[in-house]
């Protein structure tokens, strides 16, 4: 089975050789980069935001994982990693405190697109949030950035378009 994700396509468009090393040769870096780690940890906290005790336990688990890393990986993430994560997540909660929680989080999907040389090609991904409304479904997608992205980046983001098509395919509505 050939799995195609938004990340895989983005990697190929950014650098075909990097795509080859990562997805064909299956080589990976020894440790996750700060942006990837930060995004993963932020999403873990998002899933727990409706329950304060689970949120505290989740943050404690992230902290324990950080301190279990090798010294070099801790240096790569930075001394302020845990403080930055907590500060940014607390700011997020203040901004969205009056918003309702999503009906579904971390919705995984695999959609068969066809075959290539007899092998199935599957579009795969994880949708951060789904909100069910009277007028259909709303997709929530969270990204963490070092700098605030400009509107062109936000409008031209293909991930939300692909995920909208996936939701439409899976549910019959959007």
Question: Which residues make up each language-model segment?
Answer:
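A non-catalytic, helix-rich entry segment at domain boundaries
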Residues: 41-115
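Metal-dependent nuclease catalytic regions and adjoining charged, substrate-binding loops involved
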Residues: 4, 63, 67, 71, ...
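Short acidic, Pro/Gly- and aromatic-enriched capping/linker segments at domain boundaries
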Residues: 1-9
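Hydrophobic (often cysteine-bearing) scaffold residues that line and stabilize catalytic clefts
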Residues: 34, 38, 81, 85, ...
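Mg2+/Mn2+-dependent nuclease catalytic core
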Residues: 107-174
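Short amphipathic alpha-helical segments and their helix-coil junctions
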Residues: 1, 16-29, 69-70, 139, ...
